[in-house]
Amino acid sequence: MKILGFTFPDDLLYEPEKHVWVRIEDNSVVSIGVTDLGQYMAGKIFQVTAKQKGEKVNGRSVLFSIESAKWIGKFRLPIEGEVFDVNEEVVKNPSIINERPYDSWIVKIRVEDMDIIKRTFKPIQEVYKQFEEEAKRVVR
């Protein structure tokens, strides 16, 4: 789906306030990344720091942080589990998030309760209006 020129693939789930997407990989692992609109708002991303593989995470944990010339963001999500994988390509070359936000997952989490994912993250059809309002605000 396109919203004011920004792409939001239909097969992902979204959290519009944090501008993140989730891809359910199997019944316990999810990939997490930044939306097209989120990368646009951040500007050129020059650093990504992520939890290490094997680390436990909970709703207070910073799963990853992103730095750009105009913004630093720490991403906490209501997820409990363990870091299953870290995208080292993104850590080494963070600007690929700007180029390919949906191919550039940052972390994969083995989630303890998949119902939390389904309650927190929504299909684009359910959060379209929130993203549309945000896009109108930032695009001039």
Swiss-Prot record:
Q: Which cofactor does it need?
A: (R)-lipoate
Q: Which residues carry this modification: N6-lipoyllysine?
A: 70
Where the record annotates domain Lipoyl-binding, the positions are 29-110
Query: What keywords does the record list, in alphabetical order?
Result: Lipoyl
Q: What's any one GO cellular component for it?
A: glycine cleavage complex
Paste the cofactor note: Binds 1 lipoyl cofactor covalently.
Instruction: Name a single GO biological process.
Output: glycine decarboxylation via glycine cleavage system
InterPro entries to which the protein is assigned, alphabetical: 2-oxoA_DH_lipoyl-BS, Biotin_lipoyl, GCV_H, GCV_H/Fam206, Single_hybrid_motif
Q: What does this protein do?
A: The glycine cleavage system catalyzes the degradation of glycine. The H protein shuttles the methylamine group of glycine from the P protein to the T protein.
- Tell me the subunit arrangement: The glycine cleavage system is composed of four proteins: P, T, L and H.
Q: Tell me what this protein is called.
A: Probable glycine cleavage system H protein 3
